[in-house]
């Protein structure tokens, strides 16, 4: 599922089954991903991000989405600190809500 990542100029797709993740990863990078783990967040050559979360596990989703949020804030040059924590938390909330809507 492709998520709405506005207002930031990044692209994110979340994949919930390993076979689909491997197919998309291999198409983008030309190689197979390393051995399966519960979750993976990877930057693709086109600048987009692909996330895999095994069994739609909410804890894994939160973990992997945090990787994406950290990447996004670094990409736009916004440090993650007390001054910007609200922006970070609202962004994380938005991404998690979109994902949970689909898996429920």
Question: What are these model-predicted stretches?
Answer:
Residues 1-4, 17-47:
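Catalytic zinc-binding patch centered on the HExxH motif and its immediate surroundings
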Residues 45-61:
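Short pre-active-site segment immediately N-terminal to the catalytic Zn-binding motif
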